[in-house]
Structure formats: structure tokens, C-alpha cells
Amino acid sequence: MKKVVPDFTVFPVGIDETSVEEEDPVRFAVQAAVLKARAAAERHPAALIVAADTVVAAGSRILGKPDDRDEASRMLHLLSGREHRVITGVALFRQSENRLLTGWELTHVTFRQLSSELIDSYLDRMDFMDKAGSYAIQDVGGEFVESIRGDYDNVVGFPTGKIRRLIHLFERPTLLLKADRPAFPAAGARAAESGRRYYLCPAVAGDTVRVQVIRERRRIVETETIEIVEPSPDRVTPRCPHFGQCGGCLFQDLSYPRQLDLKTNHLRRELEKSGLKGLSPEIIEPVIASPAIFEYRNKMEFAFGGQGRTLRLGLRERAGRIPFRRTVGLKTCPIFGQTFEKVAPLILDFARDGRLEVHDPETGEGTLRHLVIREGKTTGQVMVILVTAEEDIAGLTEAALSLKKALPALAGFYQLVTRRQADVVTFEKTKLVFGLPYIEEKLERLTFRIRPPTFFQTNTLAAERLYGRIRDRIAAEKGARVLGLYCGAGVLETFVSSSAAAVTGVDSLPENIASACENAAINGIDRAAFIAGRVEKVPAELSGSFDFVIVDPPRAGLSPKALNQVLKLGVSELIYVSCNPASLGRDLAAATTAGYRIMSIMPFDFFPHTPHLETLVFLEK
């Protein structure tokens, strides 16, 4: 500590580290340091308390101080011949000002292959008892250590450089700033003061906030809000009790009309970045509001987190400074609805009773990955999909039947098995455990069947409005022939078929084509045909001409080959549906270069309280 400040007092505090319910090693170390700092501040409320806690992490496993020689031996054998992380959490706290600043240091250490004799010889010296990971770098040196990547002082247990920087930030006076513009599409707001730019979070544009600086970058100073001194007129009270932690929503604290304004401005900026400058105001309509701003989602992918008594089900936390996204346990999810509140407790009880553990993608251990819930917002039917890394789970059928008793709307229960490392839901192997293989959803009078992998717009009521605009445009041309590319389950093509003489849908996945044909059949549609094939190839093979081409591509937009195929068709009217303003702008720029004129751009808010939007564009040639 003398490397940091000349005058200080050292005194130990005792905390119960078992009370720290964090599975991430970085968060564990930081939270333990915070507990130490707060405990010390009870005795010295006016002093600047500097507390630290060091852990060793092998993968996601946290290694603290060993209880005895046997545990120390197991730790060292685990670390032998592999890389591990030494993490020190740091907390600076002054109780009289209620100011807290945290940080951490991380160093990668690689051990040589350690023999049992070498480990026993070290343990005989009894230097391991109060050491995280059962060793001290100054005691084992090159005998154990092959390489160190990062701060050596951190491995010793006190990262002097990090602490010096944190003290410098802490001793700076707090700032009173007026948030003058939003940080959209990110959460928070921005401010300018004395020639410097600041990022404020949490904050909304119009807030006056007191902040402390937590990080200085070349272009912007990152701050943390201590107090909202004067709230913005656009600030509202979030409905969700988990808002601010959960990453599912970013803007529940912002009035809905203001959210729509931000999305309109964001869309215009993204289009201008693509070279589409000078678009008249009447071409880009204001964002069309969602019919419902809560309970609008018909599908949610929830994640498991924790272990044992801390097992939880929810959403990944909002991205922050710590490079790990834990699962925030949810009791409710207002953007989805009350079905989650009925399903989640029963699934968690089943998992705890069966002692099922959460899957760790780094080690491959554990079973539980995600829980997907799909709900027909117009029919009330519910599908539950338990995503696991292992196939054989005892009692799963009984659990599904119990869930049916508690939730009569449950139409089907699936198990999805995926062993991919990526933390996403991928449909590799599905097994129907109970009930029907699909649920049904309605758009106006049309019925659509939804299976586990089926793409269906997340906001049912907003989709009706967007699809209705397309149908009305097609209806203005008598006897129109329509080509739908990236048709998925044929929902849009079936919806607009009543206004066309013939509709052809194209999609690369055969299972999507099968669903599209089924949806057309159950609605008695005989003017729609569907073809399996890649958009980059199929249009050139189709006979006849089309009056309209509808493209509804994935987030990345049209590939160069697909774009070339679409432009080669030379149809008089092109309709583009996009969920990504950046790729939309790129493709629209190419279309205008090829001779198309943008007639109207209509953004729809399919995702209230998030930065996302859906955009419908009509082009003519």
C-alpha cells in the first residue's frame, strides 16, 4: 500500500463470503470487496476505505482459501498444467458521502505440470492456508509458474496500479451535469461540459444528475449516476421491478412518445450513413406505435443461472463494465405477460428436485440452458420448450403433466437438446414430451400454426398493421402476381394472398416450406405456392413475371448475390421489410443506384422499450 499512499491504517474485517451469491469470479471478488469496505466503514464513516478481495478462477470455478491440506492439494492438482485467472476485486467507499467506486484487476497465470511430490513438498511448508487458490506467487515462483500475463502485483494480492487509478478517480469532486441528448440506441444519456463529453448512466435526456467519473477514455468520460437531482419531463416510472439490471429492456424509464421520436431519428441517421441523404420528411413517416407496449411479445427465450439454492430463471443482465453477462432471476416479465409467472416457478422446482445444474459452455458440464415460451396472443395457447445439454432427464414427462394442471392453456411441451458452445437457442434435436406439436396464432381471420423453430413476428398485433399496409398496396393493382423472398412459414404471403392473383414464396429451409404449405391449406388459400431454395438462385429459375417482389431478409439483409437476383427481376414495385436500419440503408442505396425510387418508408415499433424497430419500404421503378 505504501506504493500508493504514504499514510494509511490497516485493519482486518470479517465477512461471511458464503453470503455472496455470485457465480462469476469477477463479480464475486468485487462483491466481497464491497462487503469488506462497508463493514470497515461502520467503524470509520468519514474515512476513505480501500478494500480488496482476491480469488483464483479455473474456468468458471472459483477457488478461494482452502479449509485444509486435502482441499489445497485438490486445488493445486486442478491448476497443474493449465492457465487460470487471478482476480482481485477492489472497492473504495466513504460512508459519510455514500460514495462507492469499484473495479477489478485480472491476471492470467499458467502453471507447469506439477508432480504430486512437488505439491506435497510445498504443502509441507504450510504456506497455503490463507492463500486464494492455495498458493502465493512469491512462495512458488518459477517452480510452479510457467508464465504470467498481466499485473504481477495482482497475483501477489494487491494491484497497486489499479488501486492508484481508482483513488485518483474517487478523490475527484463529483459533477453536476445536465443530460442534453440521448445515447440511443444505447441506454443512458450524454452531456457536454467545459469541452468534454460525458456518458451518463443511468440517466435519460433532460435529467440533471450528480455523477462520479469511473473511467476516462480518449473521446468520452464514463460516469456513474449518484443522484438524479432534477428528473427529465420525459422520465417515467418503470413497470418492471427488474428494470436496470435485466437486459431485456433499456427504455422503460422513458415515456413512450419519446421512445418513438428517438427511433424515428435513429432510422433517419442510419439511412443517411448509407448515403441516402436528402430524403424528404414526408418519405420517412414517424414510427407507428405498437398497439400494446406491455405483454406484447409472443415469444421469449429465458436463461438459467446460478446453482442449487441460487438457481434462477430470467434474462441476461444489461451489458456493463464487467465482461460477463449473468442471468438476472425474474419474478415477472411485463413485456411478455403473466404466463412466465406461472411457468417459471414450476420449472425451477422441477430442476431443484432433480438436482439439475446449469450448463457451463466452457467446461461442458451441467444440463440446463434455456426455457423458451411461445404464446398465441389471440388464442391463448402456450408452448414450453426446455433447452438442455443432456437428453436423458428423469421425470420430465411428469413435470410436463404437472405444468398442464397448473396451466390449462399449455398445448405442448418440448425438450430441445443442443450441445453447441454458443449461448443461443439452436434447434438441433427436438422431442415432443407432451401435447400438440404446435400452437396456433391468428392474424385477423387467418390461423397459423407455430412449431418450435417457426419464425413468427414477435409482436402479433403490430405485425397485423404492417402486413395490412402491404396487402392494401397490392390490392391497388388488380390481378397482381407477387413473389415473396425469405418467406419462412409463409405468414406474410398467406396474409396478402387475398389481394393478389397469385403468390409465390421462396425459402431455403424445407421445414419452412412445409409449414408455409400447411398454413395456406388450413386457411383454404389456393393462390399461394411455395418453393424450397436459396434466394441467390431460385428467382432466376422462375418462369413468368411478377408485379411485386417482397423481401423480408434476416438481420444481415440481402447478400450481394441475392440483391443482384432481386434487381435482375426488374419488377416495377419492390417491397422491403427490415429489422435492421443499417443493412436496410445499404440495400436501399444499391436499389436506388439500380433505378428504383423510394416512395415511402414506414417504421413500426414491434419492440417497445428496446432500441429495435421494423421498417417497411415501398420502392418503384
Q: Predicted segment positions?
A:
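Anionic-ligand binding patches
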Residues: 24-172
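Short, aliphatic-rich beta-strand segments
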Residues: 373, 379-389, 447-451
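Rossmann-like S-adenosyl-L-methionine
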Residues: 53, 391-621
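Terminal RNA-binding accessory module
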Residues: 173-242, 278, 320, 529, ...
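A short acidic, helix-capping loop that chelates divalent metal ions and anchors anionic groups
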Residues: 17-21, 58-60, 250
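N-terminal G-site helix/loop of the GST-like fold
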Residues: 1-11
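Extended interfacial segments that mediate partner engagement and assembly in macromolecular machines
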Residues: 226-233, 237-238, 247-360, 378
